[in-house]
Amino acid sequence: LAASASAQDKPVPYWASIASGEAMMRTGPAKTYPGVWLYKRRDLPVRVLKRHESWRLIEDPDGARGWMLVALLSERRTAMIKPGDARSIHASPDEGSRVVYRAEPGVVGRIDDCSGSWCHIQIGKREGHVRMADIWGVDDGEVID
């Protein structure tokens, strides 16, 4: 689903994700500006840094910044496993809980129910809890219902 009018009015910065299977990042806030990156990864988390009419200045997980039409963005919260080693996905939001699987760096999942230092994450058909420190796409200590 594309971002709703309420999402367009959110104070910046805020988190979003790529809604479309193909989304062009541009050097400026208009289709006349050159495209710098064509994203082909639905649900990729992005940080919205600035608004200009129907365009948003975004930052991707690699730190690339550019402009994207708001219609190509979604309010759906997603996160990417940070670089480094595979991260443990736990049965419950507790370091001592059973590890249900391990997620490789760069894997993207949908997040919800974040509080304290943990988020519930769904990667494909698998789900569990991941430490916020292990993902990109959520602010430290952020609460997501």
Describe the role of every protein-language-model region.
Residues 30-33:
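Second-shell loop/turn segments in exported
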Residues 7-27, 38-42, 49-93, 98-126, ...:
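SH3-family beta-barrel domains
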Residues 2-4:
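N-terminal signal peptide c-region/cleavage motif recognized by signal peptidases
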